[in-house]
Amino acid sequence: MKWSEIRFWGILFGFLLGALPLLAQDALPEKSRPDCHSGHVSDSEAMQQLMRFVEVSNPMPASFKGTTENTIIDPTHELEPFWQKLSVLDRPLRIVHIGDSHVRGHVYPYIVRRQLEDDFGREAVLDMQVSYRTSGLAQETGAAGIVYHIVGVNGATCASFATPENIRQIIELNPDLVILSFGTNEAHGRRYSSAEHLAQMDNLLGELKKGCPQAVYLLTTPPGAYVRNGRRGARVINPRTKLVVKTELDYAASRELAVWDMYHVVGGERYACLNWSNGNYFQRDKIHFTQDGYILQGLLLHEAIIKSYNNYVETQLDGTWN
């Protein structure tokens, strides 16, 4: 894959020096196209200084089939308080990204973190190397800016993550935005139950909201994965992923939560796994991803975040936010 922005090599050089192999992180059974968002700018100089559009590129590989628009689904504007804080950015603005091994590997969320720091400044945190060996927690300086914490657990589901220790850690980080990336391990449960999954998400979100009333929440759907057809059978596309994604989307809609539907963005039931596989983004287990695969996922989430932020800025400048 050809990267048009040279800065990624600098970002990743330090990461790669300390990174461990990303194989088998879960305890499981086994070019850029312009996408710069511009719009009407107010004549008010103060408003222009406060509200600015952020340039972002589309990292989606041209070879990917069946993709959909890369946006955050948020019809009730649940993320508006976060966008407002981001537009002002007069203090440390804290994002906590939690999830399974896709998050624990640190590459995927670290790319989002570094991109947002490039967009909004990195003065709020110490410039420390992050790798699989290190903590994903940022070290704050006290200055205003983005603080992006990474808290992943190998093999985690919504149910297993919701321990008192994990909840307490998230609460102590005092987040303004919590990103929840689960679903891969739920989909590997051969007795998957949508009703149980809904209850587990409700429990986790309930505990987080109780301890972090100031935060807003963004769900993400899993990228897709393969599963063995029998103990020694060939790997086939996991048929339960689509059920997990539907459950997560239904839950987000019923609870008025924002969601980034990565699964359908990269091709959905028909193409997601084929796109990852044909682009050599899967590791051998076809559950976890290569370095490039996780980089791409991070770039896609970053693009979706910036597009939503730019939409907020545009509507504020035009006075059309409803």
Predicted feature residues:
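Bacterial N-terminal signal peptides that target proteins for export
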Residues: 1-11
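Bacterial N-terminal signal peptides
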Residues: 10-19
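Sec/Tat signal peptide C-region and signal peptidase I cleavage site
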Residues: 20-24
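Conserved catalytic region of serine esterases and O-acyltransferases that act on ester linkages
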Residues: 25-75, 131, 135-136, 279-322
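Catalytic His-Asp segment of secreted/periplasmic serine-dependent ester chemistry enzymes
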Residues: 26, 224-322
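Alpha-helical scaffolding within the catalytic cores
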Residues: 72-86, 159-171, 199-207, 242-246, ...
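Conserved SGNH/GDSL esterase-like catalytic core that processes O-acyl groups on lipids
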Residues: 94, 102-199, 210
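Conserved, well-ordered alpha-helix/loop/beta-strand core segments that scaffold catalytic motifs
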Residues: 179-183, 202-205, 209, 216-221, ...
